[in-house]
Curated annotation (Swiss-Prot):
Source superkingdom: Bacteria
Gene: pdxJ
Residues at the site labelled Transition state stabilizer: 156
Principal subcellular localisation of the protein: cytoplasm
Natural source organism: Pseudomonas putida (strain GB-1)
Name of the featured protein: Pyridoxine 5'-phosphate synthase
Amino acid sequence: MTHSNRMLLGVNIDHVATLRQARGTRYPDPVKAALDAEEAGADGITVHLREDRRHIQERDVVVLKDVLQTRMNFEMGVTEEMMAFAEKIRPAHICLVPETRQELTTEGGLDVAGQEARIKAAVERLARTGAEVSLFIDADERQIEASRRVGAPAIELHTGRYADAQTPTEVAEELKRIVDGVAFGVGQGLIVNAGHGLHYHNVEAVAAIKGINELNIGHALVAHALFVGFKAAVAEMKALIVAASR
């Protein structure tokens, strides 16, 4: 989903499910969190159904598909099980993410350049469901070019190294890497999203980057929601992004 005038906020609700799975209870319900997030201004809801099912479960995805008023961004590993599930659910957006060490780059994104044929086949198969397929990659020209070559219309740039940077120099270097990656991706004709490790104290610099379509944020929202409530946590983040991206 793109919007010409403003940056979008995708709310990842995985860690609401993490809290539920810690005790194997029926609460807290990630579906309720998703609906609250939408009410508070989320432009979409992101869920990652992992092979180990450590947080989100199939049932969550099925229910969310039926009740969301915005759209679902379904994160998944490149496996036959997940491909078949995505074909059944048919989410609006699918983001392919690395789940095994072989699929990872050194920074942590999907190594598209190292497995182009496999990723191309997955992108083509998933595109037939009508989904917009994106690839979660590092802000690296080689990976961005490979993403275009395999036919993905969108990418999500991994902001984890920026989030983990310790010194002002490191922060500036990692931010420049993202800025350059966004410009390169847009120049390649791709929709460029970003996310991973973003929180209330580091999001503004990324939200100020021209060319980013959407930021996906989860853990920081769930953590802040413990103290202010989920709607307030989402609304606060949305306000930061809107102000910074003007």
